């Protein structure tokens, strides 16, 4: 099955499951009160967290006057931040607080890259809160970043033009998170194809799932790449980027490629640090918000 066919199937699944619409409530409805919930896996790295600040700033410009709150899906990161005195809600806690505060319509911006396991868990929980009697009138979950061929092409073009110091013949490997045992993992394969159509020295691999770094190394050798840039295909350059990708441990991508004879230069900049990419997420949020 060709890559484009795989992408079509996966994105069709995304369209089927990409928005949680609360069931209509019977009886008298309270006045409409709208809110936006920004949801990310999360990060405990202050530098990486600046990307989320950029997203919120951009979102407030696009949706002035709308209540905005944050939620992190990672329990470990929430616990780590709590020990530092920074309290972040889980999506479920954030939904409950919004409901208690009388919000009737909630649009959720998922800062996930693909509609993988975490995205669908978020969708399912949003749907459950939307069904609760006496709660929200409507809850909609906006699509994640890579939700269409156009989104993928735009992301690829933005990332490729933001690699400082790259010369002809230098290769780039973009690190995705990956997801095991989930059909959305095929999006990384499709994204690799998108990069290849633009730049034959650009590749995608993932920390988890089927698209490992080991599948890319033979291609780097075939292309006779002298230098390899490593770039996160994640919203922030957090733990995975700083340790799994750019760390000094023997099992980091930098160390593995260096041991294979490549010169390696990591770039610690997440996708949410590029305004053109942030605007893709916000267009998805706008699409959800127009249904209110």
Q: Can you annotate each of these PLM segments?
A:
Residues 2, 13-14, 24:
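Position-driven detector of the extreme protein N-terminus
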């Amino acid at each position: 099955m060709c890559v484009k066919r795989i992408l079509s199937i996966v994105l069709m699944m995304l369209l089927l499951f990409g928005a949680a619409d609360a069931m209509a409530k019977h009886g008298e409805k309270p006045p409409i009160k709208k809110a936006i919930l920004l949801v990310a896996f999360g990060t405990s790295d202050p530098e990486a967290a600046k990307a989320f600040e950029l997203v919120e700033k951009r979102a407030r410009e696009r949706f002035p006057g709308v209540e905005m709150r944050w939620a992190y899906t990672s329990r470990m990161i929430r616990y780590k931040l709590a020990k530092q005195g920074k309290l972040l809600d889980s999506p479920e806690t954030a939904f409950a607080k919004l409901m208690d505060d009388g919000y009737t319509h909630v649009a959720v911006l998922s800062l996930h890259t693909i509609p993988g396991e975490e995205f669908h868990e978020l969708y399912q929980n949003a749907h459950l809160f939307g069904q609760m009697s006496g709660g929200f009138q409507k809850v909609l979950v906006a699509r994640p970043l890579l939700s269409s061929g156009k989104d993928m092409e735009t992301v690829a073009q933005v990332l490729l033009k933001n690699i400082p110091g790259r010369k002809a013949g230098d290769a780039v490997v973009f690190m995705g998170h990956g997801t095991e045992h989930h059909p959305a993992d095929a999006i990384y394969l499709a994204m690799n194809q998108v990069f290849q159509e633009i730049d034959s020295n650009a590749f995608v691999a993932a920390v988890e799932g089927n698209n490992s770094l080991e599948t890319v190394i033979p291609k780097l050798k075939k292309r006779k790449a002298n230098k390899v840039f490593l770039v996160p295909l994640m919203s922030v350059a957090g733990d995975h980027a700083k340790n799994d990708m750019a760390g000094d441990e023997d099992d980091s991508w930098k160390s593995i490629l260096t041991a294979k004879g490549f010169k390696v230069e990591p770039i610690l900049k997440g996708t949410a640090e590029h305004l053109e990419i942030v605007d893709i997420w916000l267009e998805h949020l706008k699409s959800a918000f127009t249904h209110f």
